[in-house]
């Protein structure tokens, strides 16, 4: 390989100057030498041609010397007159006196008809020379800009060649071929996703022994699409396939196809498949497929779309007129909803493998993999961490342990302690503590009652998730947080569970009106969450009293993703009015349930608010003891204690695991870490 590289370098540098970085310098030097020579020739043609030397004098001074009969000899060439005087003459210039005997001057443009008669009358020796007939000055002045332009272009091209970026290499594929010996990722490094790994193992088996399947009349899928939320390990699975497969593995990002030049994307697709066919059987992996695979016809413009041209070429290569045997295409995306239907049909991407958020057992396995090279103290229970992190993706868990390791180093620990992991969870999910934010007594009391309202309602209602921690310590954008941890992963939401959760979210606003007889802006995010959830109950889930067995919801398509410009609702104005009334009724019922619960447990409500004002953080166990009247069991929370929490603001019908509920008091936006469930709330 080294000999081949050396040969290529010699070929690049032999025929032309500037075949490499040093050649580029030589080429630049040659250009400057040529430009300097042309400039000198032009200057000579403009100032020097016809003037052999002498003091430059005016024509009037020349006539004066001629009238004084002091001119001995002149040489005329065109308009230039060179001559010598019989005796030295003087002239003043800028206050200086200059003596001269040889001189140079030029005839005026209108000529001098008496000059020759005057020269002959005084016996001056006159010599004439023919003027050059070729206009060198004009030619050089015209060629100089053109030559300079070519010189700049020459340097630019040589520089591109020295960097391996020839003029036409922009059309070549940017897919990288992974070496099996260099790629050390295997399926053992991928925890969870067992069904996805099994599907991919089947692809690898076909590549290793295709006759086993062909004998049964089976054909390998032409395309495999990995679909799932961000951070669930889709790209990691592809790297594992590269490490396991005994076949060439080409990897490219969807954005690598697009450039500023027209036609580059389609050309790169052709080149990529051409390379893969030469080494077939082979695997091509396209990461972030949605960057080139979006629905055609998207947007409001009617012009040609370079992305669509690239997509059309990809469709043709996957299942076009020519057979594409021996090449399997893998792709990954977290936006399958915007992919073109022609791309996802059978015959192109035959299989869609869903890589979902990990379950509790999968989270435990993922934590064990990421903790391999991290020293853990004896008090760290990875299974407990997995239980308390519902809704976390693999990337979230990796980041959690990394933040814990950084905190352990900051605290001077020899190993990662459980307190480091708890602090890391609070930091990752709620942000840093805002130590510089100081609340006055009135705001602190209002915030304490607001969070106490969430916590008491959450601890009393039977279907609500257990309260884990309540704090009024400002973190990130949140001024206060009530954390709830589900007892298990939850994929479906019951009607009574959603109603209890709505009441918990309304607990903060109910507390404000009960204690202070007013409302604050801190409940802004609470109200948004309630409206969003109540609307889904009525329109999508059939949980309204008036619309129990009908879905009125409709996906609102995005025109820039290929959907229609406008979509009208499919129900009447009267029905829309009833929907609004139903949403209002659900919200009011949730608020009233929260008020009734706080009135019923007003003593525990006041005690919890006082504890928050004094301690700023209260554990969920202490909240439950207050509700049950077991005040003797109440202890003080250490300041290092934390709990896993996440804000859920997706859709409950996504069938994703339940997550920790975070109810935030926030005067700004109340937004926390989005994790993907519908029933989280923030205030």
Curated annotation (Swiss-Prot):
| Entry's Gene Ontology BP terms | protein catabolic process; proteolysis
Q: Which residues lie on this side of the membrane: Cytoplasmic?
A: 1-28, 158-683
Can you tell me which residues the record assigns to a coiled coil? none
GO terms for molecular function, please?
ATP binding; ATP hydrolysis activity; ATP-dependent peptidase activity; metalloendopeptidase activity; zinc ion binding
UniProt remark on cofactor binding:
Binds 1 zinc ion per subunit.
The primary gene name is ftsH2
Name the domain of life: Bacteria
Q: Which residue stretches does the UniProt record annotate as biased composition, category Acidic residues? A: 655-669
Q: Which Pfam families match?
A: AAA, AAA_lid_3, FtsH_ext, Peptidase_M41
Location of region: Disordered: 1-21, 627-683
Tell me which EC number(s) this protein carries.
Answer: 3.4.24.-
**Classification via HAMAP family:** FtsH
**What is the protein name for this chain?**
ATP-dependent zinc metalloprotease FtsH 2
Q: Which residues form the active site?
A: 451
Which parts of the sequence lie on the Periplasmic side of the lipid bilayer?
Answer: 50-136
Q: Where is the composition biased (Low complexity)?
A: 672-683
**Cellular component terms (Gene Ontology):** plasma membrane
Q: How does it assemble?
A: Homohexamer.
Q: What residue spans carry the Polar residues bias annotation? A: 1-12
> Its membrane topology, per UniProt?
Multi-pass membrane protein
Q: Which InterPro entries match?
A: AAA+_ATPase, AAA_lid_3, ATPase_AAA_core, ATPase_AAA_CS, FtsH, P-loop_NTPase, Pept_M41_FtsH_extracell, Peptidase_M41
Signal peptide range equals: none
Query: Which family does this protein fall into?
Result: In the central section; belongs to the AAA ATPase family. In the C-terminal section; belongs to the peptidase M41 family.
Functional note = Acts as a processive, ATP-dependent zinc metallopeptidase for both cytoplasmic and membrane proteins. Plays a role in the quality control of integral membrane proteins.
Its keywords, alphabetically, are: ATP-binding, Cell inner membrane, Cell membrane, Hydrolase, Membrane, Metal-binding, Metalloprotease, Nucleotide-binding, Protease, Transmembrane, Transmembrane helix, Zinc
- Source species of the chain: Salinibacter ruber (strain M8)
Cellular location(s): Cell inner membrane
- Cofactor dependence: Zn(2+)
């Amino acid at each position: 390989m080294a000999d081949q590289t050396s040969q290529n370098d010699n070929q690049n540098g032999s025929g032309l100057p500037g075949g490499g970085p040093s050649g580029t310098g030589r080429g630049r030097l040659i250009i400057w030498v040529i430009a300097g020579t042309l400039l000198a020739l032009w200057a000579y043609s403009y100032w020097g041609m016809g003037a052999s030397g002498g003091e430059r004098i005016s024509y009037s001074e020349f006539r004066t010397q001629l009238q004084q009969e002091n001119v001995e000899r002149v040489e005329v060439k065109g308009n230039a007159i060179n001559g010598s005087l019989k005796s030295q003459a003087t002239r003043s210039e800028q206050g200086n006196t200059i003596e001269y005997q040889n001189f140079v001057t030029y005839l005026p443009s209108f000529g001098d008809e008496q000059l020759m008669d005057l020269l002959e009358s005084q016996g001056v020796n006159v010599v004439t020379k023919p003027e050059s007939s070729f206009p060198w000055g004009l030619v050089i002045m015209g060629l100089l800009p053109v030559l300079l332009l070519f010189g700049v272009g020459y340097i630019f091209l040589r520089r591109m060649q020295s960097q391996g970026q020839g003029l036409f290499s922009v059309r070549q594929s940017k897919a990288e071929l992974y070496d099996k010996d260099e790629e050390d990722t295997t399926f053992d490094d991928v925890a969870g996703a067992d069904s996805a790994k099994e599907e991919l193992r089947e692809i690898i088996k076909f590549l290793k022994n295709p006759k086993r399947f062909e004998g049964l009349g089976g054909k390998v899928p032409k395309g495999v699409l990995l679909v799932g939320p961000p951070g669930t390990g889709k790209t990691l699975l592809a790297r594992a396939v590269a490490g396991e497969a005994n076949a060439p593995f080409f990897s490219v990002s969807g954005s690598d196809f697009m450039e500023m030049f027209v036609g580059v994307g389609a050309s790169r697709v052709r080149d990529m498949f051409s390379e893969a066919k030469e080494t077939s059987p082979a695997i091509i992996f396209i990461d972030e497929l949605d960057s080139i695979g979006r629905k055609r016809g998207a947007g409001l413009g009617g012009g040609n779309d370079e992305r669509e041209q690239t997509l059309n070429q990809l469709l043709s290569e996957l299942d076009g007129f020519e057979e594409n045997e021996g090449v399997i295409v893998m792709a990954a995306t977290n936006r399958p909803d915007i992919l073109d239907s022609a791309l996802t049909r059978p015959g192109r991407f035959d299989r869609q493998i869903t890589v979902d958020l990990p379950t509790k057992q999968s989270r435990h396995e993922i934590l064990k993999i990421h903790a391999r090279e991290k020293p853990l103290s004896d008090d760290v229970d990875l299974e407990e961490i997995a239980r308390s992190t519902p809704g976390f993706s693999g990337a979230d868990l990796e980041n959690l342990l990394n933040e814990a390791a950084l905190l352990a180093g900051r605290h001077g620990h020899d190993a990662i302690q459980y307190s480091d992991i708890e602090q890391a969870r609070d930091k990752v999910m709620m942000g840093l503590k805002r130590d510089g934010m100081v609340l006055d007594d009135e705001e602190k009391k209002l915030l304490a009652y607001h969070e106490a309202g969430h916590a008491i309602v959450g601890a009393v209602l039977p279907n609500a998730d257990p309260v884990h921690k309540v704090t009024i310590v400002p973190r990130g954008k949140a001024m206060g947080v009530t954390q709830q941890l589900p007892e298990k992963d939850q994929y479906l939401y019951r009607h009574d569970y959603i109603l209890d959760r709505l009441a918990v979210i309304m607990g903060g606003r109910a507390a404000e009106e009960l204690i202070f007889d007013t409302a604050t802006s801190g409940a802004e995010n609470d109200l948004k969450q309630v409206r969003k959830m109540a609307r889904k109950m009525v329109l999508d889930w059939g949980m309204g009293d008036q619309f129990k067995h009908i879905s009125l919801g409709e996906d609102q398509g995005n025109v820039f993703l290929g959907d229609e410009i406008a979509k009208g609702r499919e129900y009447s104005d009267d029905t829309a009015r009833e929907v609004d009334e139903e949403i209002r009724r659900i919200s009011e019922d949730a608020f009233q349930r929260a008020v009734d619960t706080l009135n019923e447990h007003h003593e525990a409500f006041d005690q919890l608010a006082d504890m928050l004002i004094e301690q700023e953080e209260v554990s969920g166990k202490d909240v439950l003891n207050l509700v049950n009247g077991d005040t003797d069991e109440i202890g003080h929370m250490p300041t290092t204690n934390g709990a896993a929490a996440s804000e859920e603001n997706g859709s409950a019908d996504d069938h994703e695991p339940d997550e920790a509920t975070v109810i935030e008091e926030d005067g700004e936006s109340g937004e926390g870490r989005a994790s993907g469930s519908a029933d989280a709330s923030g205030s």
